[in-house]
Structures are given as structure tokens and as C-alpha cells.
Amino acid sequence: MGRMHTHRHGKSHSIRPATLRAPSWITQSPAEIEELVIKYSKDGLTPSQIGIKLRDQHSIPLIKPITKKTIGEILEENDLKAEMPEDLENIVKKAVGLQRHLKENKGDRRNVRSLELIEAKVHRLSVYYKKIGRIPATWKYKSVVAQLE
């Protein structure tokens, strides 16, 4: 995904496998992989962290070709899906951390703009997730940029 508020492209990502077939070197069955996903989720890992752990420690590049389900679908079947989508939660955490920084460092005007951009992204994502029904329609993020100025 490209960066939202700049003219540069987002280049930081791992290269996905060229084919979407299940690799021949995987010895685990789909049921065993689903159990690993459930176990890691109960340990408190997010879906992206689960995917990274499976890739790095178990040599499983993609879950979907093997299990015919995504990590999110596996978690949803087992009632382990988070209430708030992972990307929205991460951006809200980032905004809260930046708010804390700006309260301690009043002269940091540059990061006021960064907070504005982060909050704009929160609002855009929240509109999308409300529209598809992933978060409640009453969910609201309170902006603090207006209070800082």
C-alpha cells in the first residue's frame, strides 16, 4: 500500500510467493495449521503477527492456499476475532501516543500536523468499517487537534 499523505510509494513489505499453490515442503495438515493460528491468537498475537510467526518459525508462506481460509476467517469461526480491526486499532494507538507526546512537548508544532494526518486516517477508516458493519455505527473517535491549537 502506498503512503497516504506523501508522494512517495510504500516499499516496506515482504515479497509474497509467486504461486498461490500450497508448497510441497509443508508437512503440517490444514487442521494443525488452524490449531497453531488459534493457539497464537489465544496467546494474544494479532493476525499479522500470527502470519509473521507462521512464516518465520514454521516455514508457512501463506495460510489460504493450504487451509482454504484466511487467518481472519479462522479466528472468526472460533470467536477469537478482535472487536476493532487491527489496522484501525494500531492507528488509534499511534494517535494516542502522539497526543501524549504533544502534551509533554508543547513547542513541537511539526507533530501537530502529523497528528492531524493520523486523525484524518482514523476518520477515513472508521467511515469504511462502519459502512461494512465491522464496527458499530455509534463508534466515535474524539479529535484532539482542535484542543491543541
From Swiss-Prot:
Where are the annotated segments for Disordered? Answer: 1-20
Q: One of this protein's GO BP terms? A: translation
Tell me the InterPro entries matching this sequence: Ribosomal_uS15 (IPR000589), Ribosomal_uS15_arc_euk (IPR023029), Ribosomal_uS15_N (IPR012606), uS15_NS1_RNA-bd_sf (IPR009068)
Q: Which GO molecular function terms does the record list?
A: small ribosomal subunit rRNA binding; structural constituent of ribosome
Q: Which Pfam families match?
A: Ribosomal_S13_N, Ribosomal_S15
Which spans of this chain does the record mark as coiled coil? Answer: none
Question: Residue spans with biased composition (Basic residues)?
Answer: 1-14
Q: Which domain of life is it from?
A: Archaea
The cross-references to Gene3D superfamilies, in alphabetical order and at most eight, read: 4.10.860.130, S15/NS1, RNA-binding
GO CC, sorted alphabetically, is:
cytosolic small ribosomal subunit
Keywords, comma-separated and alphabetical: Ribonucleoprotein, Ribosomal protein
**Similarity field:** Belongs to the universal ribosomal protein uS15 family.
Q: How does it assemble?
A: Part of the 30S ribosomal subunit.
The name on file for this protein is Small ribosomal subunit protein uS15
Q: Which organism is it from?
A: Nitrosopumilus maritimus (strain SCM1)
The uppermost taxa in this organism's lineage are: Archaea, Nitrososphaerota, Nitrososphaeria, Nitrosopumilales, Nitrosopumilaceae
